[in-house]
Amino acid sequence: MNRRKFLETVVAAGATLAASRVFAGPATSGMRSNFAFKKEDTPVILEVAISGSTTKKVNPAVPETAAELADEAIKCLDAGATIVHAHTNKPSDNVAKAVQAYVDAFTPVRKKHPHAILYPTANFDPAVYHKNRTVWPPEIQSGHYRPLAEAGLANMILLDTGVVPLAVYDKNGMIPQKGFWWYGFWPGDNKIVIDTCKELGCGTSISVFEPGWMKNVVAMARAGTLPRGSKLNIYFADYGFAGMAPPIPEALQLYLHMIEGLDLKWSVGLVAHDIMDTPLARMALERGGSFRVGLEDWGRGPSNLEQMERAKELINKVGRPIVTGAEAIKYLDIPFAATRPKA
């Protein structure tokens, strides 16, 4: 598509939007800041993201091999995790290789915990994305989900709908050339994920890095497009990190206002630091949400199990139960046949 035709498409889309007269409503006193619910009847979804980009060189507690990932996932599930998310850190433009890395890591977990909620990350390579200034096409970046679901291993997959820059500011307050890359998804990625969920019954973990990502979620929720078994992970980062809102109550309140009136399960997460050192973990618990922990988010922190134990202490103080196993699948309404509890 040439530039003129592209601009014509954008203008036409703008005209359609204007004609639809869909606008955000005003803020009200009935927002989720005053959200009332029975704590004992509203379970917490405790997700543990056991690995990310951090290596053993940075933190010896990080699991890296398939055997280590499997062992760590099993330990976290034994300790009461609702969901385990993992990165094998073996991305490949050969989708079969990317799939096999997760098969090796997830198979022992599925055998030990048949009702576990497990999901992989997208198939992406930051070094390649930095070099090429673009992402892999959808059939590569999201092509591993279906084979993992067909194998009965991943009963949840990632539904990411936008673009976010990932970098730490340098001493001049600039995004440095070295290490910068952008994490992003095309409509084709979303179609692959939603089609996989419709056909195989996977739930989705939906990342929200910016308000625009949440607008995508709201649009799909209103249209009835979100798959069953969906939950949101709303991410924050401090002022030293490019992208994402700071971890302050006002930022979370914005997101909660955006989803007001929608029946969505949601959690908060913090990039590169401890979510429990911010007001957001307790705020989420007191408003019916959850929060996630683990070495993907707080890569330099204590072990996954130690982060879990601290999280459980806070959850117990607030007075809400943690949902696990088959009950978690029913609570999230994940229709994935291989792990759906029998009636």
Regions found by a protein language model. Name each.
Residues 158-286, 290-292:
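Catalytic alpha/beta core domains of metabolic enzymes, predominantly
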Residues 69, 87, 157, 217, ...:
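Conserved, mostly hydrophobic/aromatic
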Residues 95-120, 255-261, 311:
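Alpha-helix-loop-beta-strand connector modules within alpha/beta enzyme cores
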Residues 5-26:
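N-terminal export signals
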Residues 21-49:
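C-terminal segment of N-terminal export signals and the immediately downstream linker at the start
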Residues 52-68, 124-138, 181-183, 267-273:
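Active-site mouth loops of central-metabolism enzymes
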Residues 105-106, 110-184:
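Active-site beta->alpha loop and helix N-cap motifs at the rims of alpha/beta catalytic domains
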Residues 83-102, 236:
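Glycine-rich, proline-tolerant flexible connector loops at the mouths of alpha/beta enzymes
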